[in-house]
Amino acid sequence: MAEIKPFKAVRPKRDKVSLVAARSYDSYTTEQREARLRDNPFSFLHVVNPGYKYSQVIEGEKRYNLVRNRYQEFKEDGVFMQEQTPCYYIYKIVNHEGVAFTGIIAAASTQDYEKDIIRKHEDTLEYKEEIFVKYLKTVGFNAEPVLLTYPNNDTLAGIISSVMQTRAEYEFTTTHRDTHYLWPLSEALVVSEISEIFKKMPTLYIADGHHRSSSSCLLAQELAQENKNHTSKEAYNYFMSFLIPESDLKIFEFNRLIKDLNGLSKEEFLIQLDFSFRIENRAQHFYKPSKKHHFSMYLDGDFYSLYLRKDTYEINNALQALDTQILYKLIFEPILGIKDVRNDTRIAYTDGKKDMAFVKTAVDTKEFAIGFGMLPVTTQEMKKIADEGLKMPPKSTFIEPKLRSGITIYEF
């Protein structure tokens, strides 16, 4: 039984939302970030980059405290207002290609995370969790929701569709030509019905935001120990999430680029590859795999198709069946000598939206020696990994929608 609940969001006033909403800090180039901070005093980037006010880079506890100060200033200056009644928020994003993502912004339970009702498919890094726990404890809010997915539900879809027939509280288009819509929903009977629908769902799945959700859970445990009157219903026992149906989730692959062939000649490398894959040289013809366990490779001016020789590789669980794991186990580790795909500087990743033409250019310019492409992970594969308690290799999925910060804020 999944528990979600409505909350009183702090959010921008209607005339400011398009100016406040910001992509994740790291998604901007230095030049883009500088331009937005210089030209837009309402950007949420001012909150998360408080040192800009003094032309200083501020880090650690000092930064966290100043983030809190900037946030309070936005509230004091009337940029933000707080909802008077707990709401669910129907949220819709239509990207520049016309693809729509529609779901519900709500507070999800850290206890559900602990009980594996909310399931994970990625490993988290302890040092990142420690940093983010300190950050959350100081600032006291979530500004970017964790992306969760749930099985398609006709009743829930009907409720959402009905709400979207009314005028949206927010409707704005970004410079990326993505259009955002938000409907606060406070009607008690409908709110209760939504909560009951989720209570009947045995599991939810994290699509994006593993570090944010794990850090929220760790913080809840810490604050519970500090609170002698802890009831498990305090706001810190929840984290902001955006829940979308599985059919709306879009998963793209990450292609791989490798700096060198680990001292092997092209011919020596291909011979070693031949033991595990059937290899076909496709010359200059772009090749994108059409089946699982088929791979595209670009090397020395030629595209190759690689087909796994099934008698050379044993598949006993969902992880072993993943194409990213097959590349690691049969090529990267034994042939190219890459044992740590997270930290080895010889490997780089490019999301599948850039396609194999991007990979070709990176190899042709001699920045990399070889590139690999594959089909994206499916939602069912992602769920199976989570259900079996396994974790995907790093950079196995590039997931949309990518969410903006500052549209709704959850305080705890």
Predicted regions and their residues:
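Surface-exposed, charge/polar-rich loops and edge strands
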Residues: 1-412
